[in-house]
Amino acid sequence: MPKASHQDLRFAFRELLASGSCFHTASVFDPMSARIAADLGFEVGILGGSVASLQVLAAPDFALITLSEFVEQATRIGRVAQLPVLADADHGYGNALNVMRTVIELERAGVAALTIEDTLLPAQFGRKSTDLIPVEEGVGKIRAALEARVDSSLSIIARTNAGVLSTEEIIVRTQSYQKAGADAICMVGVKDFEQLEQIAEHLTVPLMLVTYGNPNLRDDERLARLGVRIVVDGHAAYFAAIKATYDCLRLQRGQQNKSENLSATELSHTYTQPEDYIRWAKEYMSVEE
């Protein structure tokens, strides 16, 4: 079977957005996982920013990974991927001009789509880690991203955190990003269908949700009727890989009979050492939780 080009995969992603169905992403974090996901029939994969930070730096999701490091990983995946890959480009690695550079590099890497979020990243001195940038700045980033892409089939998705805003504020932000030309709107932190319905009735572009398995949003048909086309449940495949590596190496060392049996989440927490970063952020930056 002939190999799909990067543009073929971008068109395939746009077909997902234009469909009447809801699709769940596969967590793809290296070339092998991308091939496995495609072979198993997943329609779309996602390279998460948090997963890239774990894979490249063994560091928590504190905006520590650089653009070049993220692009390198996306490029490795793009060489072999035969499913559309959506890149979680965090905040675009800086201001609107940095966003333009991010789009240029990720387009060359072969991703089918990318998200740009309006979280204030990296964390700023004396600010909360969940603070958002002004909506006007977010609009500027989306407009800059659209200007920077060469291949118009590359989807630019605006992302915001519904978990730290009122429903009215979410509507204002998402409508602003829609008006700026975003191909879709991504939201994290939507609580339930009632809130989603209130937001969705004000939007016409396709929606993407990061739910992390929220049980209040587990109804694909209902999600699809509200315009949701892409759902990110989390990155279970990556954490399963961490767990499998730990268990295999533990067995090789003859430690399989020990009572310790850490979960994937506990292992990730142990080996990324987030307490150190939290302490440093408080000590050197007065960053609030």
UniProtKB/Swiss-Prot annotation:
Keyword hit for Cell cycle: no
Reaction equation(s) it catalyzes: oxaloacetate + H(+) = pyruvate + CO2
InterPro entries: ICL/PEPM, Oxaloacetate_deCOase_bac, Pyrv/PenolPyrv_kinase-like_dom, Pyrv_kinase-like_dom_sf
Binding site for substrate: S50, R159, H235
Required co-factors: Mg(2+)
Covalent S-S links between cysteines: none
EC id: 4.1.1.112
Cofactor note (record): Binds 1 Mg(2+) ion per subunit.
Enzyme type, top EC level: lyase
Keywords: Decarboxylase, Lyase, Magnesium, Metal-binding
Residues that, per the record, bind Mg(2+): D88
SUPFAM superfamilies with a match to the protein in the record: Phosphoenolpyruvate/pyruvate domain (SSF51621)
BP terms from Gene Ontology: oxaloacetate metabolic process; propionate catabolic process, 2-methylcitrate cycle; pyruvate biosynthetic process
Keyword Ion transport: no
Membrane spanning residue stretches: none
GO molecular function: magnesium ion binding; methylisocitrate lyase activity; oxaloacetate decarboxylase activity
Entries under Pfam families matching the protein: PEP_mutase
Family: Belongs to the isocitrate lyase/PEP mutase superfamily. Oxaloacetate decarboxylase family.
Assembly and binders: Homotetramer; dimer of dimers.
Function as written in the Swiss-Prot or TrEMBL entry: Catalyzes the decarboxylation of oxaloacetate into pyruvate. Seems to play a role in maintaining cellular concentrations of bicarbonate and pyruvate.
Official protein name in the record: Oxaloacetate decarboxylase
Organism (species): Pseudomonas putida (strain GB-1)
Phylogenetic classification of the source organism: Bacteria, Pseudomonadati, Pseudomonadota, Gammaproteobacteria, Pseudomonadales
